[in-house]
Amino acid sequence: MARAPGGVRRRSGRRGAGGGGAGGGGEALRKGPWMAEEDEVLLEHVRTHGPMDWSSIRSKGLLPRTGKSCRLRWVNKLRPNLKSGCKFTAEEERVVIELQAQFGNKWARIATYLQGRTDNDVKNFWSTRQKRLARLLRGPLPAARPNKHNSGKGKAPSSSSLDSQTATFHQSSASLDQASLEGNSLGWQCREAAPFMGYDQACSGFFAFEGPLPLQLLPPADGEASSSNAAQSAPPPLLFDQPPYPLINFPGWPERYVDVGHGFVDAGAMDGLAYQELLPMVQSVPMIMPFFGMECAHDAVKHGAFDDLPPNMFDDAVDQPPPPPPPPPPPSPSPSPSRDDVL
């Protein structure tokens, strides 16, 4: 080192002895991505000398890379026991948390306690963990406000709301149908009716009753439930223009003229030629009273049904002239004038 005039030191000597640069050959340093040929040279150096003496790689002219670049390439990419792409295990996370509390952000030092992990792996893990904890501490994000452009009156409802409305509609319809069915099944019940005539049936042979009394349709009593279905307990309505004459039990009656579903004669069975075929059968059987369930037995009528009555029973009621009208009342006398009126 030569001293310049005036006491100022001046650096002297040749620059870059040996043809420029310590690496020999005057080759410039290379930066950027590594090539496959460079990785092969670095691996061969490690197999020969071990993972050390990184500066000698450039001094020997093996690679135009610095010692630091060669070391980082080996540690982060070329080591055989690297766990690249693997998540940290629970044990590794525990070690990183404890060592970070002890050493601080010394990632290279912490990585020496984890086999197959680099300082970059430890640093990335810690940064991701801190961000996740920050999101948890902030709590759930507030609900997004509806956009003014999308919150118009013509906004279509969501599929979930449509499904809930459809389910509610079907449930209401099912409830209404069930209530209607129960009302039809419990609305009318058959009960035995009381005798509708009060005369002595034993003394009168004009009508002959056969079988039980007819059934009358009455509304159900309070709290009374019917176990039968609607088809059994709710008879079809009576149409007065076509009275239902039960003809199923008549002997020899053709089945084609009987409505098996309700037990009544078809409405059109008496039309045309069917009338000529059914008329003898109708005349050969006793007549059935449609509403009272009574049979008119002509044989039961006695020719002398009135023999027991007294002979003069109808004398007073037959061939007697009407009684004469009563005489008119006499006229009432007019009042005589008083003495005061005359004076």
Swiss-Prot record:
Is Ribonucleoprotein tagged as a keyword? no
Q: Which GO terms describe its molecular function?
A: DNA binding
Where located?
A: Nucleus
- Gene3D superfamilies (alphabetical): Homeodomain-like (1.10.10.60)
* InterPro entries in alphabetical order: Homeodomain-like_sf (IPR009057), Myb_dom (IPR017930), Plant_Male-Germline_Reg_TFs (IPR053106), SANT/Myb (IPR001005)
Q: Extract the DNA-binding region annotation as residue ranges.
A: 54-77, 107-130
Pfam families, per database record: Myb_DNA-binding
Feature: compositional bias, Polar residues:
157-169
Q: Which PANTHER family match?
A: TRANSCRIPTION FACTOR DUO1 (PTHR47996), TRANSCRIPTION FACTOR MYB58-RELATED (PTHR47996:SF5)
Its name, as the record gives it, is Probable transcription factor MYB58
The scientific name of the source species is Oryza sativa subsp. japonica
Query: Gene encoding this chain?
Result: MYB58
